[in-house]
Amino acid sequence: MIRNSKILMNKLKRIGLGQITSTNNKEDNFRKCKEMIEKAVENKVNLFCLPECFAFISGGIHQFESRDNAEYLDQKGGIIERYKDLAKQNNIWLSLGGFHEKILDDPNDMIYNTHLIIDSNGVIVCEYRKMHLFDVDIPSKGVKMNESKVVKGGNDLVVCDSPVGKLGLSICYDLRFPELYLSLRRMDAQILLVPSAFMKSTGEAHWKPLLQARAIENQTYVIAAAQTGDHHSKRSSYGHSMIIDPWGKVLHDLPDNLNDIAFVDIDLDYISTCRENIPVFNHKKLNNYKI
C-alpha cells in the first residue's frame, strides 16, 4: 500500500519516506530499500528518505557488531556506492539516515553514525554525523544502550540545498534536543529530516509529541523515516514513520510493523504563510535566554 497526501498542488515538491525492518543481513536490507526507491520513482518522488540503520542493524550478537560492519563512504563496491548508483539510475535524490561510517586511522577504532544526502547524479552533497549519542539506561522500560561505546559524535550542523527545499539534517536521538533544530531553522532550514530507529517503549511515550513540537516550534515540515518491528529477539523499533506540516498537522503516520512508503506534495509557500501568521522568530529574545 502506498500512501499519498496532496497539499497546495500548484507547486509540486514531492518528498517520500520508507519504513522498514532492517536486520544484520545487508543484502536483504538493500533489496528492501531498492524496491522502495523504485516505488518512489514510479510515484514521481523528488527526494526519498530512508531511516537510521537502513543498511544494517545489529543482530544482537555482540556490542561491536555495528563497528565491525561499518564501511568507508568511498569504499569501492561498498553499500554507499550502490546507493549512489541507484540515485543516478533513477534520477532521484536520497536521504540515507544513519549509516555506520568507518573513520580512517581512528586511534580508538570508532565509527560515525552518518546521515547522507545523495543527489540525482549520484553525488554525495551533504554529510551530517550524529551529534547526540544514545547513552541511556531505563531499567523500568527495559531500555539500555551505550552508543558512544563505538560511535564518535559529530560537531557540525548541516543544512542542505535540494530540489524540494532547504533540508535540516539530524538523526534519531537528536530529536530530544530542540536547540539543534532552532539552530537549523536559523540556518534557513525549511524541512527537518529525522531518520530514526526509536525503541518501542520510548517511541510510544515521546515520538509523536517530539516530532510535532519540532515542526511547530520551527514552522517547518518534519520528515521522519523510521525503523519498525522486530530486528532480533532483543531489539524492536516503534515504527510510525511520520510526515508533519509546519502547523503541526500529521499528514502521514505509518502503522507499526508495516514496511511501506508514504509521500506528500508540499508547497514551500505554506511555510511562509505559517511563519507570517505567527512570527515567533521575530519575537524571540535570544539575547535573554541562557542556553
Curated annotation (Swiss-Prot):
UniProt family annotation: Belongs to the carbon-nitrogen hydrolase superfamily. NIT1/NIT2 family.
> Do you know which SUPFAM superfamilies this protein is assigned to?
Carbon-nitrogen hydrolase
* Calcium is among the record's keywords: no
CDD domains xrefs: nit
Q: Indicate yes or no for the key word Acetylation.
A: no
- The record places the active site at E52, K130, C172
**Superkingdom, according to UniProt?**
Eukaryota
What's the encoding gene here? nit1-1
- For this UniProt record, give its keywords in alphabetical order, as a comma-separated list: Hydrolase
Q: What is this protein called?
A: Deaminated glutathione amidase
The EC number on file is 3.5.1.128
Enzyme category, top tier: hydrolase
**Which region is the signal sequence?**
none
> GO molecular function of the protein, one example?
deaminated glutathione amidase activity
Catalysed reaction, written as an equation: N-(4-oxoglutaryl)-L-cysteinylglycine + H2O = L-cysteinylglycine + 2-oxoglutarate
Q: Quote the function comment for this protein.
A: Catalyzes the hydrolysis of the amide bond in N-(4-oxoglutarate)-L-cysteinylglycine (deaminated glutathione), a metabolite repair reaction to dispose of the harmful deaminated glutathione.
Domain named CN hydrolase is located at 13-268
